[in-house]
From Swiss-Prot:
GO cellular component, one term: plasma membrane
Name of the gene encoding the protein in the UniProt record: cshA
Motif mapping: DEAD box: 152-155
Family label: Belongs to the DEAD box helicase family. CshA subfamily.
Domain Helicase ATP-binding: start-end pairs: 34-204
Protein name: DEAD-box ATP-dependent RNA helicase CshA
Signal peptide annotation: none
Activity regulation summary: RNA helicase activity is inhibited by EDTA.
InterPro entries, A to Z: DEAD/DEAH_box_helicase_dom, DEAD_box_RNA_helicases, DEAD_helicase_CshA, Helicase_ATP-bd, Helicase_C-like, P-loop_NTPase, RNA-helicase_DEAD-box_CS, RNA_helicase_DEAD_Q_motif
Function of the molecule: The most abundant DEAD-box RNA helicase. An ATP-dependent RNA helicase with RNA-dependent ATPase activity. May work in conjunction with the cold shock proteins to ensure proper initiation of transcription at low and optimal temperatures. In vitro, unwinds dsRNA in both 5'- and 3'- directions. Plays a role in ribosomal 50S subunit assembly. Its deletion leads to changes in mRNA levels for over 200 transcripts.
Region (Required for dimerization or oligomerization): 413-494
Keyword rRNA-binding: no
Compartment(s): Cytoplasm, Nucleoid; Cell membrane
Length: 494
């Protein structure tokens, strides 16, 4: 059954905002969460980015706000600055007609400026745990009138070490309040927070089959580590994405990839947690404006980003878990548009491919490694399309005489071929250096291997002659040697 926002009996101010934002039908997480939020129930929601969860908690939160009150009435706790900004922008849009005042609070921004903004009596605070707790300790934020608390991406805050800060923040909130907790997974520390600070919460869960969007084409390429960069650049040449995000597993990888892409002639910038907030915001603005065509990011830096127009996602490194994969590809295929996601799998990472497919309930199609000739053909097609566009604009009178002179000496096909050659960006083979990353193996696969070794399988000693056991020890030594040298080893791509 389709549920529309009219079914929630919202105020006219909120309906104006919802209609202006283009919302029509409620997503599964919205259909289940909004009625519970409006009735002041505590909610535990398991949902991924891209499912509409910000509106799921934002609509009931804003509906209950009294814009005339000078008090902080709701707080939203988010793991990263980017997500805090994104959530605050969404809440501002939802509450614009109601005149609800929303203020983002995060580290990296001048605290004096934040204190001045807090004196203007915001109704809703969206902040990162550390900076929120800082203001609470300074008494520049008082939570004694808060009636709604939202924890967004609670598992990510746990991974980033914010669990103690969250407990301290919640301890400052009145006991009579509503709590909405959203988390892709429910590890034990998150469950303990729910038990301690929530009252008979209702559970809302978006099933795995609803996690990935049908209008995202998902592919994988089996490629050796040393060939990954050339594979990436050839795909960029063939597919010519309007806006692309490339995901790397580490900060070092992001820095090296961004530098290497620029060396090869692609406009690229990287974002990760070690960059200052100002630098990250500059990179994001350039990406949104199309000044750069490729954004290279870590998982944490990309959390909560809502950038329209992303056509391609490249998982240069396999994500550390299937849930991160869903977060990554959710950057494309938004607002009803189609998108493509390509994941590079090294031979030792096939277990991660299986784990991702089991989680998403969807098989990825295999894509063959692109060749150099295919990359050149891709760039030729870009040139041909540019020529067609120029011809259709019909503003060529100034060039007609020169064209006629060329045709007197050469046939038309030769002239056009020369023009295409001159205008085509040929694949660049500038040498680049990338540090190898260790392959990512599924935890389930690791556990299976460990279990087999404990059971005496896989070449271990089982009470027979010691030969197989000696070989296993030798293999382990070789593996350890490879790992220790792998941190220092660098590859050269051409």
């Amino acid at each position: 059954m389709t549920i529309t926002f009219q079914d929630f009996n919202l105020s006219s101010d909120l309906m104006k905002a919802i209609n202006r934002m283009g919302f029509e039908e409620a997503t599964p997480i919205q259909a289940q969460t909004i009625p519970l939020g409006l009735s002041n129930k505590d909610v535990i929601g398991q949902a991924q980015t891209g499912t509409g969860k910000t509106a799921a908690f934002g609509i009931p939160l804003v509906e209950k706000i009294n814009p005339e009150s000078p008090n902080i009435q709701a707080i939203v706790i988010a793991p990263t600055r980017e997500l805090a900004i994104q959530v605050s922008e969404e809440l501002y849009k939802i509450g614009q007609d109601k005149r609800a005042k929303v203020l983002p609070i995060y580290g990296g921004q001048d605290i004096g400026r934040q204190i001045r903004a807090l004196k203007k009596n915001p109704n809703i605070i969206v902040g990162t745990p550390g900076r929120l707790l800082d203001h609470i300790n300074r008494r520049t934020i008082r939570l004694n009138n808060v009636n709604t608390v939202v924890m967004d991406e609670a598992d990510e805050m746990l991974n980033m070490g914010f669990i103690d800060d969250i407990e301290s923040i919640l301890s400052n909130v009145p006991s009579e309040h509503q709590t909405l907790l959203f988390s892709a997974t429910m590890p034990a520390p998150i469950k303990r927070i729910a038990e301690r600070f929530m009252t008979e919460p209702e559970h809302v869960k978006v099933k795995a089959k609803e996690m990935t969007v049908s209008n995202i084409q998902q592919f994988y390429l089996e490629v050796q580590e040393r060939k990954k960069f050339d594979t990436l650049t050839r795909l960029l040449d063939i597919q010519s994405p309007e806006l692309a995000i490339v995901f790397g597993r580490t900060k070092r990888r992001v820095d090296e990839l961004a530098e290497a892409l620029n060396l090869r002639g692609y406009a690229a910038e990287g974002i990760h947690g070690d960059l200052t907030q100002a630098k990250r915001m500059v990179a994001l603005r350039k990406f949104k404006e199309g000044a750069i065509e490729v954004l290279v990011a870590t998982d944490v830096a990309a959390r909560g980003l809502d950038i329209s127009g992303v056509t391609h996602v490249y998982n240069f490194d396999v994500p550390q878990d299937p849930e991160s994969y869903v977060h990554r590809i959710g950057r494309t295929g938004r607002a009803g548009k189609t998108g493509m996601a390509m994941t590079f799998i090294t031979p030792r990472e096939k277990s991660m491919l299986r784990a991702i497919e089991q989680t998403t309930k969807r098989k990825m199609d295999r894509m063959k490694e692109p060749t150099l000739d295919e990359a050149l053909e891709g760039q030729q097609q870009v040139t041909v399309e540019r020529l067609r566009t120029t011809i259709s604009e019909n503003n060529l009178n100034f060039y007609m005489t020169a064209a006629a002179e060329l045709l007197e000496d050469h046939d038309a096909v030769t002239v056009v071929a020369a023009a295409i050659k001159m205008a085509t960006k040929e694949p660049d083979d500038t040498p680049v250096r990338l540090t190898d990353e260790a392959p990512m193996v599924s935890k389930r696969y690791k556990n299976q291997r460990s279990s087999k070794r404990r059971d005496g399988q896989g070449g271990g000693y089982r009470g027979g002659k010691g030969k197989s056991n000696n070989r296993s020890s030798y293999d382990k030594k070789r593996s350890n040697d490879r790992r220790s040298s792998g941190d220092r080893r660098q590859k050269k791509s051409y």
